[in-house]
Amino acid sequence: MSSLSADRKPPLDYGVQIRFIKDLDDAGGGFPDKSRLANGVGGVSNGTSSPSKYGVAVRVQGISGQPYVVLQDGEKGDSYGVQLKTQPQIQSAPPVVSQTSPYNTLLLGQREGARTPQGSYNPTDQPSSPDEDFGSPLRRPPGDGQAGTQGEAEPRTTERFTPSALAPKLDKKDNDAFNEAGLRKVKQNGIGSSLNGTGLNGSFPPPSSAQDEDQAPAIDTKSLAPINKLISRFGGGGGGSGDILNSEAQTRPRLDNRVRSQSADALNKPSEEASSTSPTINPYAPNTSATVPKLNSTKPSSTGSLGRDATSVAKVAAIPNFKPLAFNQSPKLFAPKEAPPAVPKKPVTPDLIKSQTTSIENGNGEDDQTKQAIYNILKEGSIEKEEAIKRKASLIHERFCGVKAPQISVTDSNMKTELEQAFGRNTQLQQQLDKSRRELQENQDQMVELRMDREGAESRLRQQEDQLAQLQEELRRTLENSPQSDSMQLDLLTVQAELSESQLLRQKLEDTLRQRERELTALKGALKDEVASHDKEMEALREQFSQDMDALRHSMETVSQSQLEIEEERQKVNASILAMEEELEGYKEQSEQWKKQFSSANQELLKAQQGKRELEEKLLAVVKQTDETDSNSVMKELQQCRDSLKKAQSELEKQKAETLKKQEELKSATRASEKRETELKAEIDRLINQLKKEKEELSKAIEKTQQPLVSDQTKDPESNLELQEANARLRERIARMTRLHSSVPDSSSSDALEEENRSLKTQLEESRRAASRLGVEKEELNRRLEEREREREALRRGKSDLEEQKRLLDRSLDKINKEMESMMGDSRQSVQVLQSQLEEFRDRSRRELQDAQRLSKDRLVELQRAQALLKTTQEEVSRVKKELLSCTEERDSTQLDKELLSSRLKNMETELQTDRSSQTDRSREIRLLEDKVKTLEIELDEEKSGAELLNERITRCREQVDQLRSELMQERSARHDLEMDKSALERQIKELKSRIADMGTQSRPSAGVTMLENKVQELEDRLRSEEREKNTIQAAQRRLDRKLKDVTATLDQERNQHAEQRDQLSLRVKALKRQLDESEGEVERLEGVRRKVLRELEEQRELQAALQAKVNAMDNELRKIQQSRRSTLGSTLSSDEEDNYSDTKSITSILTDSPLQTTSC
């Protein structure tokens, strides 16, 4: 391996990493011994190692989150668990590694009696001979986490690392560095007493009781469990152990809480420290009688892969005042001593407890320890009471004490193989299911397309029929009006031909649709038939299983095997309980997520309500502003706002109605699917009968075809014989004729003979033709026979293929049913979780109903207000109309004045006309707004009806939930009673079996044995009946689960619909805000137009006043002129002057009275 980089972060590790090391030179932890490299005397030669020694470094996920290195050595493969720890920054230096394995010392210490060493180690003493090579303090100890192999017989090595020379003196920081394998070197301060010669037979004296008592509270036994046993047992003993490892691997502490493992010898001698020239010292060397340390792994860190960028092995630091530890383990297992009761939760597994109970020197204290460990394991994550947990712990302890490890390993391997087979079958079945579903979906899509085509054809047919009716009516009219009837009849005939063609097309489409429907029904029927056959086979299998169980119970020799099976079932139950607890946690997390979603929805609702309030405040502010400016603009804006609000309400009502319709469609679809299923079953039965009939007809037809062939074959030789006879006769006749011809030379006789020859030749030709015909017919019959035989063989092959497919499907269905039965235990707890969820949904639905009722009340109040505002606006509109009429009258008067005075008045008239057109557009808009108000009122009524329908649906859902709950409670009580009866029966059976076993030991059988056997049979019958009742209860529970799932699905759909409605409302509110802004702009524009009109009116009034002043001035001038004329002229002209004066008066009166006339108009 390359040196580890310090820049990258340590990757997380969740599995097992195994590294096979060919030689300890590749992954050593210290300097080689010069004396060893020079010469070897004793056990091991120079440069080589014994082939019996080997080692494997395995990185395994620990029980409580700690990683381990499993070190193996020797022929028996003993293993030692060592904790691994990660380091955030790594600096690697390639160390020089020793050549011999350091593990035999520990093995011998274990085999000779688990003794603790005495004495201390002087770091200045170095081994001087190869006999002391194994006990060198520079060697790696077995518990330092650096695994290596020695020997040339290891075939799995993939890499070989060349050791590099280190400096003769290293600092303490160098001791913390990593080797090439990514493992940290071990630091050790003290090692045991002197050697005894070879370094392979060191003995450990027994420890004192005082040392054990002082040492107990300082020991952490979490990291010293035998990991190979855990892997072999928890890998196949059910799903419980793997779940524990994975769950605890996800909850590891951080890197900052690392605690280095402690050395045992460092406690006895705190003053001694390792020299700078020995970075890794072997505490297990036999030459110094080193103590075996127990690595303290209180706070594990997050681990990566062994030898990667971010992983290392825990450093064995020299800590003072640590006392030597003791071994109390059998040769195969390295187990810790009794842990103190102060540790509340210790990761002890049932396999570790079993290995501890098998040891010879364990007493009552170890039994208590195992019980306490089981209690701690069961207590983690459980909700049950302490008494129940204690009972379970005692039962598990009693069971595991009597079970043997080899039997469990065999059963575990069998279970593993069965599980793998079941998983493979399950995947195959799932693939088949997916294929069938895809085919069904494709058929349904084709059905939909055909239906669409059919509907299109029907629509075309209707159009053509309508055209035909129109043509017939036109024909009648034309017949009545025009004499050209022939052409019309021809047209009618063409139309009828087209209609017939369209009918034929329609029939074809209908036939194709029916064929597709038949195919679909056939597929569904086949599926249903397979399901029914699977159920029947399941019942037959259950009966066979019950018979086998009876035979096993009758045999007294298999009592011990049945006990072992019961214990295995208990283990499975415990594993299933752990899995159920994990599912409970998952359901709790889901409930928390739903609560978060509900809180977010409430927040969004509150935001929407705040936005509504802000809109209302804006509306009030707009109303106040409009009151200040003008009443007309205010009323228009209010109308627009109300219209937009009504539109939004109408849209909401439509959405609710659509949701109700969708729900009704779903119900109708489910009903239709049920009806289709019943129809499919009937069609399947009909098809089966048809197939049987067709098979019979085929067999009859084959027999009929064979009979004429046989008859033809019998006839053919007869016809050949007849032909041969006819040929023979003809030859005889020809011979006769030739004789006669030779005897009679007359011409008449020669003619007769020629005629006879001709007739005979024609007869020969006819006979040959008949023979050829018969041969052709024979060949045709043979061909037909061969074709029939081929068809028959094809039918047989298809039949065999179908039977094989049916068998495969039946097997797969059996497997699925078995898996479903195993999953029933999981569904029971899910029902409880669903009940709690149902209660939560019920509370939520009540709250949502209350909110909806409040919202409906608020909307009703708003509608009433809007109606009142509409009335006031209508009154204001009428007043505005009156004002508009007065304005138009004033404009007309001004127009007349302008026509009389100047062209400027004409321009003003054009502008007034444009104003009139805008007023007509406004009146049209007002009418449209009134129509919209009416439509909104209608939509409001529809929304009220939809709300009532929703309330009725919610009441129905509540009633269904109550019914389901009552049924669940009844089934639970029944199930509890059945379980109690079953446990009582099992106890009775055990007592009876124990009695039978006692009676079997006696020499003479008594009548009591037969009585006991009869009782056992009766109890077994009772157990069978109870199992049947339990199956019925499970079926009912499945139905209830389905109902609950349907209810939850409907509730989820309604919740989603409410969320969509809320989103749409928020969008509608935004649109209303935009409309408000637009209406405000229109109001401002209208106000500008009004001001402009008022200005123009004022200008016109000013002009009118100016004209009036001019007219008055002209009157005064006329009067003055008349007075001057009267003084100058005589009396003769007085009458003429008076007439002129009257004329001027009339002109002024016309000018002054013109506005009055216009107003009257």
Swiss-Prot record:
Bias-annotated ranges (Polar residues): 84-104, 117-129, 273-305, 1143-1161
Principal cellular location given in the protein's record: other
GO biological process terms, semicolon-separated: microtubule cytoskeleton organization; posterior lateral line development
Biased composition (Basic and acidic residues): 755-773
Coiled coil ranges: 413-1128
Compositional bias annotation for Low complexity: 189-203, 742-751, 1124-1134
Domain of life according to the entry: Eukaryota
Record keyword Ubl conjugation present: no
Localization: Cell junction, Tight junction
Region: Head, residue numbers: 1-403
Keywords per UniProt: Cell junction, Coiled coil, Tight junction
InterPro entries: Myosin_tail
GO cellular component assignments: bicellular tight junction; myosin complex
Function text: Probably plays a role in the formation and regulation of the tight junction (TJ) paracellular permeability barrier. Note=Localizes to the apical junction complex composed of tight and adherens junctions.
Subunit structure, interactors included: Homodimer.
Family the entry assigns: Belongs to the cingulin family.
Record protein name field: Cingulin
Species of provenance: Danio rerio (Zebrafish)
Species lineage: Eukaryota, Metazoa, Chordata, Craniata, Vertebrata
Name of the encoding gene: cgn
